[in-house]
């Protein structure tokens, strides 16, 4: 029950702290306000204070100004020279007499006045407004540094707030008696690799079981195959050569031309019988009176020659 009450109080405190507006005093104290005033130039100092003294902008009015109806209507041009921020800086730099003050006077007066005004007003200024004023004044680097300080201080406050709910070291609950740990087995010592010796053992090789006749068969087969192959190749080459060249030269091939024939004229007589079948002149007498004589054979051949000449002449006509 007590733990639930403490947890509820912690949640309620954090919720109230989160809903409360974060002030500038959370990020800087009186000394930080003086340092902030010293970091700003005279122009930035006057602009920064004018932005902080200005009333908080109305969100509803800003939204209505950015509405579609207002954007559709053209706004009248501002004929005044310079922006309001520049005009405010120029007015702040001038004294009531109307003359422009020197850099030293403006710097000292503005910084002192800003530091004196910011110290009591820091509690009522929100962090968003202070950071927005620094960015509009042209010093976003100072805004980032103040944001880091704010985050660090908030973290420290949260840690300090939570320390109250943590149990004290002396009032810690007693830890139940733990049983004695079992004795562990003796650890196996790590081997010393440097003290070990490398031993290489070679297994016995098996006996050579092949006989000399194991290579004689392949060798004889190779020689026989080579001889037969060479002989067959040579015979094939010889046959192809003879077939291409037309034989051994004694006779002509079927496609080659034969020997030149002698041409006989029309006045030459052509023998009817070949030389081998002609008989000598004495053989005609021995045959008897009925056998044809050589003169009758000559006359017959002349007659046939004349007929062949006549037929040749007719063919010529």
From Swiss-Prot:
It is a single-pass type I membrane protein. GO terms for biological process: signal transduction. It comes from the Eukaryota. Keywords: Glycoprotein, Membrane, Signal, Transmembrane, Transmembrane helix. The chain crosses the membrane at residues 219-239. GO terms for cellular component: membrane. This is Transmembrane and death domain protein 1. It comes from Homo sapiens. The gene is TMDD1.
């Amino acid at each position: 029950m007590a733990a639930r009450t403490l947890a509820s109080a912690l949640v309620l405190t954090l919720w109230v702290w989160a809903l409360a507006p974060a002030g500038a005093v959370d990020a800087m104290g009186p000394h930080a306000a003086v340092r902030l005033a010293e970091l700003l130039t005279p122009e930035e100092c006057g602009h920064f204070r004018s932005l902080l003294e200005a009333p908080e902008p109305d969100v509803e009015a800003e939204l209505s100004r950015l509405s579609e109806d207002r954007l559709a209507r053209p706004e009248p041009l501002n004929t005044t020279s310079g922006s309001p921020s520049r005009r405010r800086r120029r007015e702040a730099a001038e004294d009531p007499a109307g003359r422009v003050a020197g850099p030293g006077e403006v710097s000292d007066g503005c910084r002192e006045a800003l530091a004196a005004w910011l110290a009591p007003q820091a509690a009522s200024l929100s962090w968003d407004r202070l950071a927005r004023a620094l960015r509009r004044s042209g010093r976003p680097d100072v805004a980032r540094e103040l944001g880091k300080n704010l985050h660090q201080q908030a973290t420290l406050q949260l840690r300090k707030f939570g320390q109250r709910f943590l149990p004290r070291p002396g009032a810690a609950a007693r830890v139940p008696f733990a049983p004695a740990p079992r004795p562990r087995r003796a650890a196996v010592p790590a081997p010393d690799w440097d003290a070990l010796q490398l031993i290489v053992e070679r297994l016995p090789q098996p006996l050579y079981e092949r006989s000399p006749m194991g290579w004689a068969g392949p060798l004889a087969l190779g020689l026989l195959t080579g001889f037969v192959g060479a002989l067959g190749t040579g015979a094939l080459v010889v046959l192809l050569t003879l077939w291409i060249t037309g034989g051994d030269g004694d006779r002509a091939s079927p496609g080659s031309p034969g020997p030149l024939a002698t041409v006989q004229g029309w006045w030459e007589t052509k023998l009817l019988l070949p030389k081998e079948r002609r008989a000598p002149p004495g053989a005609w007498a021995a045959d008897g009176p009925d056998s044809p004589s050589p003169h009758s054979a000559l006359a017959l051949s002349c007659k046939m020659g004349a007929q062949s000449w006549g037929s040749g002449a007719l063919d010529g006509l």
